[in-house]
């Protein structure tokens, strides 16, 4: 039994030993067959070429069936020996790899100049391309040889020549949009691109046509994963960088920023030099018009900052394919130079004051606002619960309504207690003057006793008791309660109102108001300048008019002028003119001024262009003030102490060089001795040479003589040239002979000129 079992164990061992022997014999037979094929005639070798071509087509079909993630055994692989044949004329050598085939053609068929076998004509098939250098022919051979050592780091595509790879890399410049999407996984390709379809295995095990399955993981560096290690970037071209994440439309160019920067600097310089009047609305609007539409370097309102960082960059290359971070890239940042007209703290403070004055001109000047077509004067600034405005900046002065309460109080205290039936139909009884004054001064009184005839309180077309309440310092909260009590009455002339009302004519030279106005007339009143104001007369007071002649004819008696405590000194011209003409001042309600006429126009008559221009000016001034104040708060200015030290050093250097230059200039011009004599060209040069030769000692007596006769230059300038010659001879004719000759020549010339003139 043991022998039988041992025999059974020996039989498998013998069979295992026989199998390698049989395999070796089969390999030997195959090798002999290959050697026999090589020894066969050329006719049989030509017949084997189509067979090899069929094998190559079969290998290509197998590569198309397999997924792209798995690299197939290419014909140029070392495992497929003899698959590449040299097609050079007269050569049929087989090479295992493309590298070996390339080396074979370059060394054997092209040759070298050193070995005296250089061939510059391509003999591959029927090419017959001729070059002038060996490098050119070797580069041309790569076209025929399936050798592609240069691979793209983006898509992995291989190229035969480095110049072909360079051209291909440029096509990936548009692929940078793949990294611009902020969504997660934006760099991935969710679906295979067009043309990435092949033959795969379906669920039933059969071949089916459909999308090729992706063989790479997350994230995909490229379309397929090569099995060989990645090569380093080709040294023939450098890294390529692309800007991502920034839209070019939002990047302001340096030229446009510089243009706005220079315009703003020039504007500040004109402000410092007072090139335009900041109190004139027309001048301010015209000057601000140059700044509209420019990218000003302001730090708010969406303006472009002075410092603009460079966009983030994405590098290409690195050895892993796809897009990669290129590490820290040296950015080239730029900034604009500091403004020359806005450097020191004093400059900033002065500019802020000028801007505030301009802002006050735009806001507070009623005539300018009405001329701009914005609204009626004061419509953009309303006191009380109706406080609404069309702008974002507050007026600079709004507390002047209790500056002069004594003026209207005096007028109210001296008026009579009678009210006419045309003004109030509900009350006709007399009121004592003391109660009127008390009601005027009382802060709890909701309405005044009567409407005073003060034309200095408002220059609008109507008169409202609210004006009196505001002039006495009453709270604006009482205004709405008094507004609804008075209706809007038709306007009458000043003389009718004067004759019908019970107001005495000794209080004011202006005609008392005979009508009431709307609720908003008081809101149109201006509180600027610290004093009461009224509109400018619509005509020139120096020229007579038909209306003034009619007023003079109908005047009953002369009226005294207003007291200086009632109106401001700015209206003294109108008061003096009233005294000269001896006529009562016309009420603005009877003959409205052009400003009032413009203000009385409705919203439909406004000019949209003027209103828009006014709003833009207001916003621009506010932005400029915010910019200046921000620089003051941040300390963004040059220290004045350091600037003074540098100025002192420059002054000291200039003082050292000043004596020599001063003496040379005096000697050249001769201003110290002969200020009235004109010397030009060679005469001035000769005078300077003579003064230098005579020396300091000879000049001292001349200076003494000049001090003794201080009136000599003046007399010489007012007398004739003959008197100048005599005085020059008396002063020292031996000192300056050249100047004497010049004087003689000038005298002769002047005499000739006088004769010619006669």
Curated annotation (Swiss-Prot):
PROSITE patterns membership: ZINC_FINGER_C2H2_1 (PS00028), ZINC_FINGER_C2H2_2 (PS50157)
SMART domains, A to Z: ZnF_C2H2 (SM00355)
Chain ranges for the short sequence motif YPX[LI] motif 1 as given in the UniProt record: 486-489
Composition-biased stretches (Low complexity): 224-233, 406-446, 470-481, 585-602, 659-668
Chain location of the short sequence motif YPX[LI] motif 2 per the record: 736-739
Disordered: annotated segments: 1-48, 177-235, 383-612, 635-737
Cellular compartments annotated: Cytoplasm; Nucleus
Mapped zinc finger ranges (C2H2-type): 84-109, 120-144, 150-172
Primary localization: cytoplasm
Post-translation changes: Activated by C-terminal proteolytic cleavage by signaling protease (probably palB/RIM13) at neutral to alkaline ambient pH.
GO biological process: positive regulation of transcription by RNA polymerase II
Acidic residues bias: start-end ranges: 637-649
Segments of skewed composition (Polar residues): 448-469, 490-518, 709-721
Disulfide topology: none
Bias kind Basic and acidic residues: ranges: 546-561, 691-702
A single GO molecular function term of this UniProt record: zinc ion binding
Keywords, sorted A to Z: Activator, Cytoplasm, DNA-binding, Metal-binding, Nucleus, Repeat, Repressor, Transcription, Transcription regulation, Zinc, Zinc-finger
Known function: Transcription factor that mediates regulation of both acid- and alkaline-expressed genes in response to ambient pH. At alkaline ambient pH, activates transcription of alkaline-expressed genes (including pacC itself) and represses transcription of acid-expressed genes.
Protein family per UniProt: Belongs to the pacC/RIM101 family.
Protein name (database record): pH-response transcription factor pacC/RIM101
């Amino acid at each position: 039994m043991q022998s039988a079992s041992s025999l059974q164990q020996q039989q498998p061992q013998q069979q295992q030993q026989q199998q390698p022997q049989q395999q070796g014999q089969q390999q030997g037979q195959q090798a002999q067959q290959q050697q026999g094929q090589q020894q066969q005639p050329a006719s049989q070798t030509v017949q084997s070429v189509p067979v090899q071509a069929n094998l190559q087509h079969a290998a290509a079909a197998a590569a198309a069936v397999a997924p792209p993630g798995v690299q197939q055994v290419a014909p140029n692989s070392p495992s497929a020996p003899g698959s590449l044949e040299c097609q050079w004329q007269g050569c049929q050598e087989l090479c295992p790899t493309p590298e070996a085939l390339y080396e074979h053609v370059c060394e054997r068929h092209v040759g070298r100049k050193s070995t005296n076998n250089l061939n510059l004509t391509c003999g591959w098939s029927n090419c017959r391309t001729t070059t002038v250098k060996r490098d050119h022919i070797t580069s041309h051979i790569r076209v025929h040889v399936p050798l592609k050592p240069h691979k793209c780091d983006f898509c992995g595509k291989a190229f035969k020549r480095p110049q072909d790879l360079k051209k291909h890399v440029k096509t990936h410049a548009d692929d940078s949009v793949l990294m611009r999407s902020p969504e997660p996984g934006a760099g991935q390709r969710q679906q295979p691109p067009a043309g990435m379809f092949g033959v795969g295995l379906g669920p039933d095990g059969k071949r089916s046509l459909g999308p090729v399955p992706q063989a790479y993981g997350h994230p995909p560096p490229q379309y397929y994963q090569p099995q060989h290690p990645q090569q380093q970037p080709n040294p023939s071209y450098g890294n390529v960088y692309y800007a991502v994440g920034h839209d070019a439309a939002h990047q302001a160019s340096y030229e446009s920023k510089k243009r706005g920067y220079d315009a703003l600097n020039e504007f500040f310089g004109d402000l410092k030099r007072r090139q335009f009047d900041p109190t004139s609305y027309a001048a301010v609007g015209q000057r601000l018009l140059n700044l509209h539409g420019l990218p000003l370097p302001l730090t708010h309102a969406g303006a472009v900052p002075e410092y603009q960082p460079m966009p983030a960059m994405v590098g290409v290359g690195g050895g892993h394919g796809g897009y990669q971070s290129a590490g820290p890239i040296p950015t080239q940042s730029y900034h604009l130079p500091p403004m020359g007209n806005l450097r020191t703290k004093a400059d900033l403070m002065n500019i802020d004051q000028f801007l505030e004055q301009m802002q006050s001109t735009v806001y507070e000047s009623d005539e300018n606002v009405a001329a701009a077509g914005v609204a009626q004067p004061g419509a953009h600034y309303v006191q009380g619960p109706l406080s609404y405005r069309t702008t974002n900046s507050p007026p600079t002065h709004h507390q002047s309504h209790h500056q002069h309460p004594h003026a209207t109080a005096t007028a109210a205290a001296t008026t009579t207690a009678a009210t006419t039936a045309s003004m109030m139909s509900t009350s006709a009884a007399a009121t004592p003057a003391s109660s009127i004054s008390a009601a005027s001064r009382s802060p709890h009184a909701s309405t005044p006793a009567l409407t005073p005839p003060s034309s200095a309180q408002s220059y609008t077309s109507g008169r409202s008791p609210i004006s009196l309440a505001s002039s006495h310092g009453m709270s604006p909260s009482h205004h709405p309660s008094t507004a609804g009590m008075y209706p809007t009455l038709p306007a009458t002339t000043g003389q009718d109102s004067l004759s019908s009302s019970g107001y005495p004519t000794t209080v004011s030279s202006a005609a008392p108001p005979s009508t009431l106005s709307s609720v908003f007339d008081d809101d149109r009143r201006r509180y600027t300048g610290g004093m009461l104001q009224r509109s400018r007369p619509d005509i020139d007071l120096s020229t007579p008019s038909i209306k003034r002649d009619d007023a003079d004819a109908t005047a009953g008696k002369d009226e005294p002028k207003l007291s200086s405590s009632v109106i401001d000194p700015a209206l003294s011209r109108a008061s003096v003119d009233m005294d000269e003409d001896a006529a009562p001042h016309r009420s603005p309600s009877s003959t409205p001024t052009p400003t009032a006429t413009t203000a009385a126009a409705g919203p439909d008559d406004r000019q949209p262009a003027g209103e828009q221009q006014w709003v833009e000016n207001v916003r621009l001034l506010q932005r400029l003030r915010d910019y200046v104040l921000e620089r003051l708060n941040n300390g963004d200015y040059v220290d004045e102490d350091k600037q003074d030290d540098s100025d002192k050093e420059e002054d000291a250097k200039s003082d050292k060089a000043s004596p020599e230059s001063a003496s040379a200039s005096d000697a050249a011009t001769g201003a110290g001795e002969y200020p009235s004599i004109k010397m030009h060209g060679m005469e001035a040069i000769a005078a300077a040479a003579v003064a230098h030769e005579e020396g300091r000692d000879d000049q001292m007596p001349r200076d003494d003589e000049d001090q003794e006769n201080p009136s000599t230059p003046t007399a010489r300038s007012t007398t004739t040239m003959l008197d100048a010659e005599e005085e020059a001879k008396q002063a020292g004719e031996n000192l300056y002979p050249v100047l004497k000759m010049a004087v003689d020549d000038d005298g002769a010339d002047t005499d000739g000129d006088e004769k010619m003139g006669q």
